[in-house]
């Protein structure tokens, strides 16, 4: 099993005729992802990379049966694209776009309340179920099928963690990039719940960063509910207060959201943390050995 997506997931690409979307559509198709439709208003009837283009999400869904959308639409128009996908009742929308205005996302979040559409992102690398379905911008080749779930606020740190696991012979179920913006859709707890309920996932890597309280809330949830080992890493340990570090949400303000605070909370809730990015893989191995599941995680031929 996997979480959120699998080899049967039918995907549409919003903004497919843009150069970034075209590049990544080809990469996703090469990975084996079932991309059945693209959406660009005014470009309906075209075919790009063998994928039919429609004017609206509703039309694309009705014609192809797509249930998931990935958005590469420029920031000023991305919020409207999310709302259009929600209006079409898609199961999930994965928004890659960065620099969406915060107020736009506040409106989107409010609009999605009570609706069935799950939003992942924005400003995220996407979601990948190893060897089955890649939706987003992550490098597919580093991901190998196995039993470790990965959830992260950072794209590049996700790739680093996955690469280390694969090099150690440890495959993954699904890797979910929840995005680095202050207002996003799916959060750590949503993904941890999914991993906790997934029979194939035996351990989890959670990568956070400075800013906000999402990691602390996740730590408390892990302590109360998680039945599988979780290891963590917090980015931004050397960040000065008030200085934004890369992501819009990665800022320490009012003395809250420091790496030190997050690490302390995670450790007190039973989550082992890696001191540096290069130790994420070895920290997972240590936790797996303590839990007696290390051998069962070795699914990749090195």
From Swiss-Prot:
Active site positions, chain numbering: 247 (tele-phosphohistidine intermediate)
This protein's UniProt keywords: Ligase, Nucleotide-binding, Tricarboxylic acid cycle
A GO molecular function held by the record: succinate-CoA ligase (GDP-forming) activity
Family matches, as InterPro entries: Cit_synth/succinyl-CoA_lig_AS (IPR017440), Citrt_syn/SCS-alpha_CS (IPR033847), CoA-bd (IPR003781), CoA_lig_alpha (IPR005810), NAD(P)-bd_dom_sf (IPR036291), SUCC_ACL_C (IPR005811), Succinyl-CoA_synth-like (IPR016102)
Positions bound to CoA: 17-20, 43, 96-98
GO biological process: tricarboxylic acid cycle
E.C. number: 6.2.1.5
GO cellular component terms, semicolon-separated: cytosol; succinate-CoA ligase complex (ADP-forming)
Catalyzed reactions: succinate + ATP + CoA = succinyl-CoA + ADP + phosphate; GTP + succinate + CoA = succinyl-CoA + GDP + phosphate
Quaternary structure annotation from Swiss-Prot or TrEMBL: Heterotetramer of two alpha and two beta subunits.
Function: Succinyl-CoA synthetase functions in the citric acid cycle (TCA), coupling the hydrolysis of succinyl-CoA to the synthesis of either ATP or GTP and thus represents the only step of substrate-level phosphorylation in the TCA. The alpha subunit of the enzyme binds the substrates coenzyme A and phosphate, while succinate binding and nucleotide specificity is provided by the beta subunit.
Protein's name according to its UniProt entry: Succinate--CoA ligase [ADP-forming] subunit alpha
Source organism: Staphylococcus aureus (strain Mu50 / ATCC 700699)
